[in-house]
């Protein structure tokens, strides 16, 4: 199972990572969001563009104006490096000049564009050499404490390492790890020096920045003994040092199991848990980031963290004013609530659900993503499912489906999938318009679509018994908007055997038709889709979608007698041509022919009967049908043959003509087809047109004539739906989710 975790950002960065989400395969639709870089030092990055000098002079001006003479920046940096190097070869070096050079390079390094020049001019080796302890004995007299010099060198190295991985390696190759670890261990020495704590803090920052996203350097830090002093510094009196140590542990623990194990073995967890309760957002922010990285892909450490009492403080941080802390807390809650965890209910009981739902409305998209992730995990418990829905979680999660970011959509969809497992939530889903939202299909990745499909199937399997009764009650008593949403949802979700109960007995069809008649184009599309789905469910196939059966008349003389003078007792005249026929077959086929030859009409005793207004080839096909009960209807003759079949009341032939014509219905001819069906009372063709309109409503809605046409056919839609819903329907088998 792949879960990306947060990592400690180097000092340089102030922009959050935008790595694409990774969607795991367990649970099958759950997105495991990536931990983002900390923004603890984002403000510091912005300050680099400003002056850090206490006297207010602009940094660049101060650095490049030496002895009141402007000089080139490269030359200035080169001079500073030369001064730093001179102390190692000149016993009479100017100590103050060295301190000033280190401070100037540190200030220059605060501007990203300067770092490359600093590196190219050999500053890294010189800076690393000054990381040694200032308490070096010269003869029998110790040198004075020079913590500011060390602090500035450490600060410069940390800023340089933050720029690119190549600089990290240059610093390590210059031998920085060992002296940096020694600085971390300098606890209690020269406590009276004002910069002593700052040196330790900047040393921790070096660890943070050289180890960032560099597995080999993380391992080197552990091998050189760097983890133990960092753990000890978590209890340092200076809060800034605590924070820096937690940040360094956060970095070195990311995706490094050996480092994680050592941190836990050194008993860092209790102190990190205490730091979660700090009122300083920068402190609890680093602590929760470190804990998150320790927990990542480490079930045993996760249990240790919970046993150390982290659960309640983490839940409390969901209400932090720091967005990054909220995000980290939500992600950690999601990890605590993993599928194999038994503390989902405990998390809810301790008050996590309400702040998580509130976080769904955050302006920070990553906070939203992590809170949806946590709710998705918590929603795997039945009691939590009801609690999340009761606190308004369904509506907030549905709204997230409109967000275009794939990971946010997917986490929201997965949470909704969990909530749909509880029968108590079905009505809330539908009342909130959730079915329409799920069916809008505005999803950016296929796994989210798959998740939504399964959610709809899960809801569909619950539309029976008490759930159906509750929805029917609401459809009778609730406000009109809710009634319509229920009708729309049930059209897609109900069992066909309940169609009459819902849509005829409880007026569901009328709600859908009202929406089709009066509403906006979007609502009309919802209605047409619901009616089309309902029609498909109510019949295994529509009449126009299958060829009709042969007619049930008793006498078929056979095709060999078509236009055969043998035993012919009547001759039809069509287009001046003679067509030989037999009254016995004609009378048996149609009431019109029966009245013509058995009634009081003049044709009864006539030998020749003229047939006007019909073409020979059409009449011949009609006779073939009468004599044999079957014909192949050419598409170009179908309409004329339909007219003839209607005129002579040949219902079997008429049905076959309607079937043939229905195959030619398209977006361009639907008005003409419907008019043809209406003119000749071709009910099957008319219903084929109706079904086509419902199926292709969205495409047709752009036509200027369509709005009027829809209102014209609503009576036919009502008649059609009433007819098919009152037929006996076999129950559909349940869908397994």
Curated annotation (Swiss-Prot):
Weakly expressed in the emerging lateral roots and mainly expressed in the shoot apex, young leaves and flower buds. Residues 568-635 form the BTB domain. Keywords: Nucleus, Repeat, Ubl conjugation pathway. The BTB/POZ domain mediates the interaction with some component of ubiquitin ligase complexes. Forms a heterodimeric complex with TCP24. Interacts with the origin recognition complex (preRC) components ORC1A, ORC1B, CDT1A and CDT1B. Interacts with DUF7/AIP1. ARM repeats lie at residues 112-154, 165-212, 215-254, 257-296, 299-338, 341-380, 382-421, 456-495, 497-536. Pfam families: Arm, BTB. GO terms for cellular component: DNA replication preinitiation complex; nucleus. GO terms for biological process: DNA-templated DNA replication; negative regulation of cell population proliferation; negative regulation of DNA-templated DNA replication; protein ubiquitination; regulation of cell population proliferation. It comes from the Eukaryota. Its main location: nucleus. It is found in: Nucleus. This is ARMADILLO BTB ARABIDOPSIS PROTEIN 1. May act as a substrate-specific adapter of an E3 ubiquitin-protein ligase complex (CUL3-RBX1-BTB) which mediates the ubiquitination and subsequent proteasomal degradation of target proteins. In association with TCP24, exerts a negative role in cell proliferation in leaves, possibly by inhibiting mitotic DNA replication. Pathway: Protein modification; protein ubiquitination. The lineage of its organism: Eukaryota, Viridiplantae, Streptophyta, Embryophyta, Tracheophyta. CDD domains: BTB_POZ_ARIA_plant.
């Amino acid at each position: 199972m792949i879960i990306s975790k947060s990592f400690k950002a180097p000092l340089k960065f102030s922009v959050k990572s935008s790595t694409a989400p990774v969607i795991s395969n367990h649970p099958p639709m759950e997105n495991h969001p990536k931990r983002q870089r900390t923004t603890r030092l984002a403000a510091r990055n912005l300050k680099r563009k400003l002056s850090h000098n206490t006297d207010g002079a602009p940094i660049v001006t101060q650095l490049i104006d030496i002895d009141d003479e402007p000089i080139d920046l490269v030359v200035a940096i080169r001079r500073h490096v030369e001064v730093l190097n001179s102390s190692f070869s000149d016993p009479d070096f100017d100590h103050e000049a060295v301190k000033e050079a280190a401070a100037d390079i540190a200030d220059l390094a605060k501007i990203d564009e300067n770092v490359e020049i600093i590196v190219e001019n050999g500053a890294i080796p010189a800076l690393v050499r000054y990381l040694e302890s200032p308490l070096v004995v010269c003869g029998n007299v110790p040198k004075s404490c020079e913590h500011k010099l060390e602090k500035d060198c450490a600060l410069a190295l940390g800023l340089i390492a933050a720029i690119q991985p190549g600089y990290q390696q240059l610093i390590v190759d210059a031998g920085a790890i060992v002296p940096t670890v020694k600085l971390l261990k300098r606890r209690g020495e020269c406590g009276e020096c004002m910069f002593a704590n700052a040196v330790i803090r900047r040393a921790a920052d070096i660890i943070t920045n050289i180890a960032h996203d560099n597995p080999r350097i993380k391992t080197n830090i552990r091998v050189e003994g760097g983890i133990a002093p960092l753990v000890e510094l978590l209890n340092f009196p200076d809060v800034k040092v605590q924070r820096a140590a937690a940040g360094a542990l956060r970095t070195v623990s990311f995706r490094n199991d050996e480092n994680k194990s050592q941190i836990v073995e050194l008993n860092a967890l209790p102190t990190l848990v205490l730091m979660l309760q700090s009122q300083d957002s920068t402190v609890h922010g680093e602590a929760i980031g470190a804990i998150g990285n320790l927990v990542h892909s480490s079930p045993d450490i996760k249990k240790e963290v919970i046993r150390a009492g982290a659960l309640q403080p983490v839940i409390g941080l969901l209400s932090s004013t720091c967005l990054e802390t909220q995000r980290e807390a939500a992600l950690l809650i999601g990890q605590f609530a993993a599928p194999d965890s038994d503390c989902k209910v405990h998390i809810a009981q301790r008050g996590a659900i309400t702040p998580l739902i509130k976080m769904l409305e955050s302006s920070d998209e990553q906070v939203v993503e992590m809170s949806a992730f946590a709710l998705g995990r918590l929603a795997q418990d039945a009691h939590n499912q009801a609690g999340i829905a009761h606190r308004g979680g369904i509506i907030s999660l549905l709204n997230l489906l409109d967000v275009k970011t794939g990971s946010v959509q997917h986490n929201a969809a997965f949470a909704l999938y969990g909530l749909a497992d509880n029968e108590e939530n079905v009505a809330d889903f539908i009342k909130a318009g959730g079915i329409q939202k799920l069916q809008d299909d505005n999803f950016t990745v296929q796994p989210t679509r798959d998740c939504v499909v399964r959610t709809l199937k899960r809801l569909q399997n619950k539309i029976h018994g008490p759930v159906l009764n509750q929805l029917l009650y609401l459809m009778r008593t609730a406000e009109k908007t809710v009634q319509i949403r229920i009708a729309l949802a049930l059209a897609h979700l109900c069992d066909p055997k309940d169609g009459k109960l819902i849509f005829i007995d409880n007026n569901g069809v009328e709600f859908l038709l009202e929406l089709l008649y009066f509403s906006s184009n979007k609502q009309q599309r919802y209605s047409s889709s619901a009616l089309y789905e309902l029609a498909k469910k109510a019949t295994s196939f529509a009449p126009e979608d299958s060829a009709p059966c042969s007619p049930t008349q008793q006498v078929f003389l056979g095709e060999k007698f078509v236009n055969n003078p043998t035993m012919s007792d009547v001759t039809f005249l069509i287009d001046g041509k003679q067509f030989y026929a037999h009254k016995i077959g004609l009378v048996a086929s149609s009431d019109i022919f029966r009245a013509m030859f058995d009634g009081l009409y003049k044709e009864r005793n006539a030998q020749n009967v003229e047939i006007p207004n019909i073409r020979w080839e059409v009449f011949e096909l009609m006779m073939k049908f009468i004599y044999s009960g079957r014909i192949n209807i050419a598409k170009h003759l179908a309409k004329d043959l339909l007219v003839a079949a209607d005129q002579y009341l040949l219902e079997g032939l008429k049905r076959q003509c309607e079937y043939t014509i229905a195959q030619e219905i398209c977006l361009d001819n639907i008005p003409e087809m419907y008019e043809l069906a209406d003119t000749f009372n071709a009910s099957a063709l008319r219903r084929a047109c109706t079904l086509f309109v419902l199926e292709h409503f969205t495409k047709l809605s752009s036509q200027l004539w369509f709005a009027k046409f829809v209102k014209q056919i609503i009576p036919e839609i009502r008649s059609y739906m009433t007819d098919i819903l009152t037929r006996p329907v076999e129950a559909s088998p349940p869908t397994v989710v």
